[in-house]
Regions:
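Short, glycine-/small- and polar/acidic-enriched structural segments
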Residues: 32-181, 198-201, 219
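Conserved C-terminal helix/tail region of periplasmic/extracytoplasmic solute-binding proteins
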Residues: 315-351
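Extracytoplasmic/secreted envelope proteins and their assembly/folding machinery
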Residues: 52, 56, 61, 86, ...
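Short, surface-exposed acidic
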Residues: 73-74, 171-177, 280-293, 324-331
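Secondary-structure end/capping motifs
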Residues: 244-324
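Pocket-lining segment of extracytoplasmic ligand-binding domains
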Residues: 111, 174-177, 181, 186-278
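Short, low-complexity disordered leader/linker segments with a strong preference
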Residues: 1-41, 345-351
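Short, solvent-exposed loop/beta-turn-alpha elements that line the ligand-binding surface or hinge
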Residues: 62-72, 223-228, 296-306
Length: 351
């Protein structure tokens, strides 16, 4: 009889376990997850460029790692082209990334909405220049000229094609008279110096470098290229799956990003030195003080991804043929966590 009572008691315990949905260790695992003690490696993409200033300063000062705590590890992955970074996202090799809005839009489209923009990083910071011996004064004078951009479909390329359209011009592939070529920024400098291209639309610090190192003329400054400079040059993207599983990690990452944006804007000289140190460490080449100062004057370090401009870029991508059709942009920009962070810090939320 005593044995039957023991068996009955064990059966009741088992039944309770089934109905509560817990095995012997399930409760402790759930409490660990809710307490944020699971170890997660967060793979973050970035460029060694001043347009990714928050990433560079954050790397140098360990800001993101401190924000995420000891239970998680930041793993930085360096890229030099947005297309390569998007490929890594599509392969599931990245979780969060600093990137240009053009590639971000492409990633959102190719992933069928799995890649989302969750914050801005920098605005503007691109200029249109011509080689020193050409008296190009405006966009109309690009008629019959060869113009370089860093990459087809990126922010500078879309901006250039917009400018051409606004001035009654088209590129040669569309039956127009302007030849658009793509080349890496260092190669654009060489091509301009050797008179193998006539003009270029490039991001900082390359705009300042072309002016100071090969005597390029500024045709349009940063605030004349598009929307008076109120357009994104770099944004933060995340895999939706990662965001859903690790919203707390993404929120803490954004807290660090917002703090870094404030720090850079309030301590521009000190921050530019930190950025330059990171660029030197990563590329083995430093920027001169005058180029760095000139470049930063053309940039706006911000948390705002300029949603309206980003949506307009989608339309430009369709118009120029980089996207076959416009995707549903409803989930392209997700500012819920960013606005939560901004509200907690007493800062204005972004619409």
């Amino acid at each position: 009889m005593k044995g039957k009572k023991i068996i009955l008691a064990l059966s009741i315990v088992s039944i309770i376990g089934i109905f509560t949905g817990c095995g012997p260790n399930q409760g402790s695992k759930d409490s660990e997850k809710s307490a944020g003690t699971d170890n997660t490696t967060v793979r973050v993409g970035f460029f060694p460029n001043i347009t990714h200033s928050q990433a560079l300063v954050g790397r140098e000062q360990n800001t993101f790692q401190k924000a995420l705590g000891d239970n998680h590890k930041i793993e930085w992955k360096q890229f030099n082209a947005g297309s390569s970074e998007i490929e890594a996202f599509l392969a599931g090799a990245l979780d969060i990334g600093y990137i240009g809005p053009g590639p971000a839009i492409n990633g959102y489209t190719k992933s069928k909405g799995d890649i989302q923009i969750i914050a801005g990083a920098t605005d503007a910071g691109a200029i249109l220049v011509s080689r020193k011996d050409l008296p190009i004064k405006d966009v109309k004078a690009l008629d019959g000229k060869k113009v370089a951009v860093p990459q087809f479909g990126n922010t500078q390329d879309l901006s250039l094609r917009y400018l051409l359209t606004q001035n009654g011009l088209k590129d040669k592939t569309k039956g127009g008279t302007v030849e658009i070529v793509q080349a890496d920024n260092p190669d654009i400098k060489t091509l301009l110096d050797k008179k193998q291209i006539d003009a270029a639309l490039v991001p900082e610090p390359w705009g300042s470098r072309l002016v100071k190192e090969v005597g390029a003329n500024v045709v349009l400054d940063y605030d004349k290229v598009w929307r008076e400079g109120k357009y994104p040059t770099a944004v933060i993207i995340v895999r939706k799956e990662f965001l859903q599983k690790h919203a707390d990690i993404v929120e803490n990452f954004l807290k660090a990003h917002v703090d870094l944006t404030d720090y850079i804007n309030k301590n521009s000289n000190e921050a530019s030195d930190v950025v330059n140190k990171q660029i030197t460490d990563l590329t083995k080449k430093s920027l001169s003080k005058d180029i760095l100062d000139s470049a930063f004057k053309r940039l706006t370090v911000t948390n705002n991804p300029e949603k309206d401009a980003t949506i307009e870029m989608v339309n430009l991508s369709v118009t120029t043929g980089f996207l076959k059709q416009a995707p549903d942009t409803k989930d392209l920009v997700n500012l819920d966590l960013l606005n939560k962070v901004l509200k907690e810090k007493g800062q204005k939320e972004i619409q």
